[in-house]
Amino acid sequence: MRGARTSFPFPSFLSAHADGASRARGDMSAEGVASASSVSAKASGLIQPSRRRLLGSLAMGVALLPLSACSMFGDDAAEPPPYPVPRLGDEKGMRLLWKNTGGSDALVGFQPAISGNSLWVVDQKGRVRRLSRKDGRVEHEFKAGKAIAGLAADDELVVLVSRDGTVKGLSPKGEQRWEARLDSEVATAPVLADSAVLVRTIEGRVLALERSGGSTRWSWKAPTALLNLWQSSPMVTDVDTVYVGLPNAKLVALDLRFGVPRWDVAIASSLGATELERLIDIVGAPVLMGTDLCAVAYQGRVACVRTSDGELAWSRALSSSVGIAADDRDLVIVDASEVIQLLRPGGGTVWRQDGYVRRGVSTPVIVPDKRLLFGDRFGNLSLLSMNDGQTLARIEIDDSALATPPLLAGDEAYVQTQEGTIAAIALR
């Protein structure tokens, strides 16, 4: 058992509750086993219409409207405020171990993956590389020959997924073990669970493939949404469940063995006069917080539900375009105004940090010693204290945003920027 992991960057059955959350049961079912058989812009989650395509100017507007904070500020936007002055200084908070600048641009959702002492990365040109975690040296590389959606890795298996639905299982050294072909495009990185490889297609299908040979164990299809994000919310697993964020602010818990839904819940209700105003997809990966599963919806709410049955624990009207982070006690959100807030169970705000507005803050991650790590659109990594939200340290990686949240491994973090820089940072 390896614990919880996330992959590396989205007309319902709602019954409104007084607190703004809603529940639905019995509207989703597992399908029989299926046979195994779009390059986005540099933005975190380009919105796209589903198979029931929107026509005219709405469809064009959807294709051009990203959710990334960068997109909210054109060239004529006001400059962001000066960075908060670090309280301690860079050398005491985090330290750059190495940088590898030999890659090409990385799409949003391209996250490094760890396998033993190696770090696997992919880039927009379809190049796959295995780097040494010690110094960033290239140990092995090859061209995938097609557009990549993402990868996942552990000490036993590396899985590479192409956007056309080709899934390849590799050894930790890069030798191909198996290949499976899906009948749909993929825009999200896979997830490696102890017992299966989990892949999500752009049409809302979740498939569990055998780790040993790539055959399909089960397939489950979400109800079709008229409008949804091109890049789906990453999936999260625990011992026997996979949690999936869906359009219309829904969360579903699937049995990892059979793909049968255990529960599903909508954490927000769709409001607004237009399709874009009613868009409330889950943003970022859901996070496990003790015995709760927490998530945030774009133009919606942040909420936590019980993992056992999906019952609402708490909910608050607070939107985000990047996502949340959590540990067993606290939840951190970058709200729609890019104010960073720490929330306690129940949704109350402990502190607010507004020194990073208009900087395109990434999804944060919680690192050892109760600190918060995140990037911004100017290529900087910042480290905050979770006790009071004060800035502890900041270092520059390059001049572009992160492709995904930082990847943690003990007291080290690995990042990949949209310009292709791979960097290792010591958090001590």
Model-derived features: positions:
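Bacterial signal peptide processing site
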Residues: 71-74
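Structural signature of WD-repeat beta-propellers
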Residues: 123, 162, 201, 246, ...
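Conserved beta-propeller blade signature
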Residues: 119-120, 158-159, 197-198, 242-243, ...
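N-terminal secretory signal peptides
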Residues: 1-67
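Blade-level signature of beta-propeller repeat domains, shared across WD40, Kelch, NHL, RCC1
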Residues: 402-428
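Short loop/turn segments that connect beta-strands within beta-propeller blades
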Residues: 132-135, 171-174, 211-213, 256-258, ...
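Extracytoplasmic beta-rich repeat domains
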Residues: 76-83, 90-113, 138-154, 177-193, ...
